[in-house]
Curated annotation (Swiss-Prot):
Tissue expression profile of the protein: Found in heart, brain, spleen, liver, lung, kidney and testis.
Organism: Mus musculus (Mouse)
Record GO biological process: intracellular transport; melanosome assembly; pigmentation; platelet dense granule organization
Cytoplasm in keyword set: yes
Start and end residues of each stretch annotated as Disordered: 218-239
Protein name per the record: BLOC-2 complex member HPS3
Length: 1002
C-alpha cells in the first residue's frame, strides 16, 4: 500500500538557458549538467553562485543518441549516430574545453600515446573512440570504479577504466576492453553496472548477475570460463512454429515469473564469459552468479498497446556508508562493498530490490497514473508522468541500518522496518514532462508541451490490436515541433522537510492513529539517509542533522510509549538514541489531574522499567519518583519492589513507598521480596523495630532467595562505582553470615561478577584497594566451599593463600571474627585437605600467642594438602614465610613433600625439628619411597649420633626407632647390608636378633 501525503519535498526551480532544444540530458557529478542537442553538448554549472550558467560547450562527432557521465574518471560517454552508423565515444578532460576553437585530441581506446604528445593532453579535451563489432544499444558507468559496460544485441562488453602513467606528475585516462559477456535470449534495452553487479533489462524481462573475480595468480581461466545451463533451450524449437501465428493477429505471451538465486538458471537465458584483458590485469572476472530473474506478461485484457507495458528506468544504486553512524555507537565492522539496490519499473508499478547477502524485494510502488521515467536516490524515488512529478519515500537507509549494525533491533538501537508501507510525499503538477535526472539536491526536468493531437477514431474494444497495427502507429512522426524547457528544481533540505513532516504528524497525534507513527518513521528515515555519507556534509549541516536525528528518536519514543501493541517495546531503544534523560522523558508524559485513575500504556512502562534496571546515574526528584511508583502501582504492581530498589528512586518519600508496598499482598508478588523491600524502607526511615520484625518474618534461606530476586537491595552502582546499601551495611554488623550467603547466591545466579563482589566487600568494610577485610576472606572461603562453576579455582587458591601468608608473616589478626574455623572448612569442603599428623608435631612445638594465627596456619596447611591444588604454582606466594618459624617450616615441608622432594624435607626436619622426623617418615616414606628409610634417614641419624651435640640423645632415640622400623621391613641379609660398617656391634645386636627371630618365626 502507498500512503499519500501533501508535503513539500521540492523547492525553488530555475530554467536552464540552453541554446538548442535538448535531446539528451545527464548530470555531471556534483557540479555540472550536460545537455545534448544534435551534435552539440553544453555543460552548465549547478553549484555555487554560477548556478545554471554555461561552463563550456563542445561539438560531438555525431548526433548524440544516449549519454552518461561518470564521476569516477570525470568523463562523458555517448552513443552517437553519423551517416546511419552508430559510434561509441568517451569525452575526457572536458573541463579544459574553454571555447569552440580549443584543440581536441582523438585517440583509439587502449592505444598507448606517444610521449611527445602526452604533455599536450594536459590542457585539452580528448575523445576516445571505442570501436564495436556490433552497434551499441545502451551502456552504464560503474559509479564506484568508473568502468564502462556497453550493451549490444547478444553481448555486453566491459571496458575497464585505467590510468596510463606518463610521469610522476601526469597520467592520462584510458580504457581496456577486459571482458565480453555473451547473453542469449534477451536483448538489452537498458543495463546497469556497479562493482561487478550487472543488471540487464529488456522490454519485459530483468536479469541481475554478479561477476565474481579472483586474483590473477589464482585459478586458471579458459577462453569461455563459464557457461550457465539453459534448461529451456527446447523451447526454442517451437519458435518457428509460433512465428506464423505471431505474424497474424495473435501474440504469444509467456507467464510472469520471479526467480531468485540458483533458480534463475531456469530462465532459459545463457550467459558466457570471455576474458579479453591483458595477462597482467589485477582482477579478472572468472565466474558469473545469477541473482534475480523477473519476467512480466502484458495485460491484454485492457487491449492496450504493447508500448504501454514496457519496463523502464533500470538502476543499480550503491549507498556508501562512510563510517559515520548517527547512533554514535557504531561497533559493527565496515564493508568495502557498498550496499546495493536494484530498481526497475513498469508504467504503473515500480519494484525496488535489496541486493546484499541475498536478493529481496523491499518495496512495490503503485503509481496513480502511467509513469514515463523514474530515478532512485538514497532518500526518495522521483517519478515523472506526462502531467506530474511524484516523490515517494524509499527504505534504503532502513535496509542499510538493519544489515550493517549488529546492535540494531535490540534494546540499544532501533530503526523503522524495511517492510513499512511507502508513501507519496507529493504529486506536483508539471505539464509535458519527458525526462528526469537527479544529483545532490537538484532534479533536472525536461518538458515538451506538444500540441494536441487530432483525436483518432477509436477502434472497437472487442477487436484485439495486432502487432502489425501497433508497429505502424508507433512509427507515425509528430506533425508539429514542441515547445520545450529544461528546469533545475531544488529539493528541500532534509532538516526542513523533516520539520514539516513532524508538524504534519501532529495532526494525527491526538487520535493516536498509525499515520502519526508512520509519518514520524518516514521523518526518521529521511534524516538517517541524509547522515549515511557523513563525509560529504559540512560540519554545521552534520550537527543540524544529528540534532534532528536525536529529536526524531524522541518523537518515535513518545509515539511508541503511548502504544499497547507488540511494538510498544521500541520506546526503549528510541528514547536511548534520543539522548533524553529519564526525567526529561517523564516530563513529556501527559499527566492527567485524576492521576489515580490514569491508564499508563505498555510502551512507557516498559521504558521506565528497563531504564531503572540500568545504571543511569540519574536521581529522580521526589515528585517524579512518586509518579513512577504510582505508574507501577497501577500498571505493573509486580515490578514495584524492583522499581523502589533502583538507585534512581532514592529520593522517594519512604511513607509513599510503604503505602504502595502494603498493597502488594494480594498481587502475586514474592512475599520475601516485599518483606526485604519494606525492611530497607524501614531502615531508611530509622524504624528499627519494624526493620527487625520484617527480617525475622522469614528464614535465612528465604531471605537469600529474596536478595537473589533483587540484588540492588544489597549492591548498587553509581557513576561506575559499587555502592553498598544501608541494608548491606546493617547486615555486616548484625548478620554477616546472611550477607555472605546472599552475595554468594547472587554470584551463583550470575547477578554479580567476581570483580564486583571483591569491590563490594572492600567498600563495605571501608578498606582501600590493597587491603582485604576478613569478610571478603570469609566470602572467598564460602566460594571454595560452594564450588561455583564460574569461579576459577586456581585464582581463588591464590587469593586465599596470599592472605593467609600475609597475616602469618605480619602477625596480623583478622579485623572481624572469621565465620568459619579451619575445622569447619575441612569438614565442609574437599578443597581443604586433611593435614598430616606429622604437621601437628611441628605446630605444637611452637607457642603461638593468638589462636587466630593457629587457625590461619591450619587453613593454609589444609589448602596445601588439597588434591585440587598445583603446589608448584603457589611456592612464590610462600616466600614471605621464613623457615625459621614453624609456619614457614611446616608449609615449606608440605610443599616439598607434595613435590616428592623427600630427601630435602628430611634434611630440613632433622635440622629444624627432629621430633617430627619419625612421624613424617611413617606417613610419607611408603611403597616406592620406603627405601629412603635406610638410604637417607638411617645414614643421616648415624652421622648425627657420631657427631654428638646437644641433641645427641634425641638423635639416638630417633636412630633406635628407625632401626626398629627397618628391622621389621627387611630380611636379615638386607638388614646387615644397610648397617654402618663402623658401628658398635653391641648397639645393633638386639635389632639383628629381632630380625633373625622374625625370619625363623615366618
Amino acid at each position: 500500500m502507498v500512503r499519500l501525503y501533501n508535503l513539500h519535498p521540492f523547492g525553488s526551480q530555475q530554467v536552464v538557458p540552453c541554446q538548442w532544444e535538448p535531446e539528451q540530458v545527464c548530470c555531471g557529478g556534483s557540479d555540472a549538467l550536460f545537455v545534448a542537442a544534435g551534435c552539440k553538448v553544453e555543460a552548465f554549472a549547478v553549484q555555487g553562485e554560477e548556478l545554471c550558467r554555461q561552463r563550456c560547450a563542445f561539438s560531438t562527432l555525431g548526433r548524440v543518441l544516449r549519454m552518461a557521465y561518470s564521476e569516477a574518471g570525470d568523463y562523458l560517454v555517448a552513443i552517437e549516430e553519423k551517416n546511419k552508423t552508430i559510434f561509441l565515444r568517451a569525452y575526457v578532460n572536458w573541463r579544459s574545453k574553454r571555447s569552440d576553437n580549443s584543440r581536441v585530441c582523438i585517440r583509439m581506446v587502449g592505444h598507448n600515446v606517444e610521449a611527445s604528445f602526452c604533455e599536450s593532453f594536459r590542457d585539452q579535451m580528448s575523445i576516445i573512440e571505442m570501436p564495436m563489432s556490433e552497434a551499441p544499444l545502451c551502456f552504464s558507468c560503474c559509479p564506484v570504479k568508473g568502468d564502462l559496460l556497453v550493451g549490444c544485441t547478444n553481448k555486453l562488453v566491459l571496458f575497464t577504466l585505467k590510468y596510463d602513467i606518463i610521469n610522476e606528475e601526469f597520467s592520462i585516462l584510458n580504457f581496456e576492453r577486459s571482458l565480453i559477456i555473451h547473453i542469449d535470449n534477451i536483448t538489452p534495452v537498458e543495463i546497469s553496472f556497479c562493482v561487478g553487479y550487472v543488471a540487464v533489462m529488456s522490454d519485459l524481462e530483468v536479469l541481475l548477475l554478479k561477476l565474481e573475480s579472483d586474483p590473477i595468480h589464482g585459478e586458471s581461466v579458459d577462453h569461455h570460463p563459464q557457461e550457465t545451463s539453459n534448461p529451456l533451450k527446447e523451447a526454442e524449437g517451437v519458435s518457428n512454429e509460433t512465428s506464423q501465428l505471431e505474424s497474424e493477429d495473435f501474440v504469444i505471451c509467456l507467464k510472469p515469473m520471479e526467480l531468485i538465486g540458483e533458480k534463475c538458471e531456469q530462465s532459459g537465458i545463457s550467459v558466457k564469459l570471455e576474458s579479453t584483458g591483458l595477462e597482467d590485469e589485477k582482477v579478472k572476472y572468472l565466474r558469473v552468479r545469477h541473482l534475480l530473474y523477473r519476467r512480466f506478461a502484458p495485460d491484454i485484457s485492457s487491449y492496450v498497446l504493447s508500448d504501454n507495458i514496457k519496463l523502464h528506468s533500470l538502476q543499480l544504486l550503491p549507498i556508501h556508508q562512510s563510517g559515520f553512524h548517527p547512533d554514535e555507537n557504531d561497533l559493527s565492522p565496515k564493508k568495502e562493498m557498498p550496499n546495493l539496490f536494484c530498481f526497475f519499473s513498469l508504467p504503473h508499478v515500480g519494484y525496488l530490490y535489496m541486493v546484499v547477502k541475498s536478493v529481496e524485494l523491499m518495496s512495490v510502488y503503485w503509481y496513480p497514473e502511467k509513469s514515463q521515467q523514474a530515478v532512485l536516490t538514497p532518500q526518495f524515488l522521483h517519478v515523472i508522468t506526462s502531467q506530474s512529478l511524484q516523490c515517494f519515500t524509499v527504505r534504503c537507509s532502513a535496509a542499510v541500518a538493519h544489515e550493517e549494525d549488529l546492535y540494531m533491533d535490540t534494546t540499544l538501537k532501533a530503526c523503522p522496518p524495511v517492510s513499512m508501507d511507502v508513501c507519496a510525499l507529493r504529486i506536483q503538477l508539471f505539464i509535458g514532462l519527458k525526462a528526469i535526472c537527479h544529483f545532490k539536491n537538484h532534479i533536472i526536468l525536461l518538458t515538451k508541451a506538444e500540441p494536441e493531437a487530432i483525436p483518432e477514431r477509436r477502434e472497437s474494444p472487442k477487436k484485439l490490436i495486432s502487432r502489425k497495427d501497433a508497429s505502424v502507429r508507433s512509427g507515425t512522426p509528430h506533425v508539429a515541433e514542441a515547445a520545450w524547457n529544461l528546469y533545475l528544481v531544488n529539493t528541500t533540505a532534509p532538516v526542513q522537510l523533516y520539520k514539516e513532516m513532524v508538524d504534519y504528524s501532529n495532526s494525527y497525534k491526538t487520535v493516536k492513529t498509525e499515520s502519526c507513527l508512520h509519518l514520524l518513521s518516514e521523518a526518521h528515515l529521511l534524516v538517517r539517509a541524509a547522515l549515511m555519507d557523513g563525509s560529504q556534509l559540512e560540519p554545521a549541516e552534520k550537527a543540524e542533522l544529528l540534532e534532528a536525528f536525536k529529536e526524531s528518536c524522541g518523537h518515535l519514543g513518545d509515539c511508541y510509549s503511548r502504544l499497547t501493541t507488540e511494538q510498544s517495546h521500541l520506546a526503549l531503544p528510541y528514547y536511548k538514541m534520543s539522548g533524553l534523560s529519564l526525567a526529561e522523558v517523564l516530563a513529556r508524559v501527559d499527566w492527567t489531574e485524576e492521576s489515580e485513575s490514569q491508564k499508563y500504556e505498555r510502551g512507557l512502562v516498559f521504558y521506565i522499567n528497563h531504564s531503572l534496571y540500568e545504571n543511569l546515574d540519574e536521581e529522580l526528584s521526589k515528585e517524579l519518583a512518586a509518579k513512577v511508583a504510582q505508574i507501577f502501582h497501577m500498571a505493573e504492581p509486580k515490578q514495584l519492589p524492583h522499581v523502589l530498589s533502583s538507585p534512581s528512586m532514592k529520593n522517594i518519600d519512604p511513607l509513599t513507598a510503604l503505602h504502595y508496598l502494603r498493597k502488594l499482598d494480594s498481587c502475586g508478588v514474592s512475599p520475601v521480596l516485599v518483606t526485604l523491600t519494606k525492611a530497607a524502607v524501614a531502615l531508611k526511615m530509622g524504624d528499627l523495630d519494624m526493620y527487625r520484625n520484617e527480617m525475622k518474618s522469614h528464614s535465612e534461606m528465604k531471605l537469600v532467595y529474596g536478595f537473589i530476586l533483587e540484588p540492588r537491595l544489597l549492591i548498587q552502582q553509581w557513576k561506575g562505582q559499587i555502592v553498598p546499601t544501608e541494608l548491606a551495611i546493617d547486615l555486616k554488623e548484625t548478620q554477616p553470615g546472611l550477607l555472605v550467603a546472599s552475595v554468594l547466591g547472587l554470584q551463583k545466579n550470575d547477578k554479580i561478577g567476581i570483580v564486583e563482589t571483591d569491590s563490594f566487600f572492600k567498600v563495605l568494610c571501608g578498606k582501600d584497594e590493597d587491603a582485604v577485610p576478613q569478610l571478603l576472606i570469609d566470602f572467598w572461603e564460602a566460594q571454595l566451599v560452594a564450588c561455583l562453576p564460574n569461579v576459577v579455582l586456581e585464582e581463588l587458591f591464590f587469593k586465599l593463600i596470599s592472605q593467609y601468608v600475609w597475616r602469618l608473616s605480619e602477625r596480623r589478626c583478622p579485623d572481624t571474627v572469621p565465620l568459619r574455623t579451619a575445622e569447619d572448612l575441612i569438614n565442609a569442603c574437599s578443597h581443604y585437605g586433611l593435614v598430616n599428623p606429622w604437621v601437628h608435631v611441628l605446630t605444637t612445638s611452637d607457642s603461638l600467642a593468638d589462636k587466630n594465627y593457629t587457625d590461619d596456619l591450619l587453613k593454609l596447611q589444609s589448602l596445601i594438602c588439597s588434591p585440587s591444588l598445583d603446589v608448584a604454582s603457589i611456592i612464590p606466594f610462600l616466600e614471605p614465610l621464613s623457615e625459621d618459624t614453624v609456619a614457614g617450616l611446616s608449609t615449606h615441608a608440605l610443599c616439598h613433600t607434595r613435590l616428592q622432594e623427600y630427601e630435602q624435607c628430611i634434611d630440613t626436619l632433622l635440622e629444624r625439628c627432629p621430633e617430627a622426623v619419625i612421624a613424617y617418615a611413617n606417613q610419607e616414606l611408603k611403597e616406592d619411597h620406603w627405601i629412603l628409610w635406610w638410604k637417607k634417614l638411617l645414614p643421616e641419624l648415624c652421622q648425627r649420633v657420631k657427631s654428638g651435640g646437644e641433641r645427641s640423645h634425641l638423635h639416638l632415640s630417633l636412630l633406635k626407632e628407625t632401626l626398629s622400623v627397618i628391622a621389621v621391613g627387611l630380611d636379615l641379609r638386607d638388614f646387615l647390608n644397610v648397617l654402618p660398617e663402623d658401628g658398635a656391634a653391641a648397639f645393633f645386636l638386639p635389632y639383628l636378633l629381632f630380625c633373625s627371630r622374625k625370619k625363623s618365626l615366618t
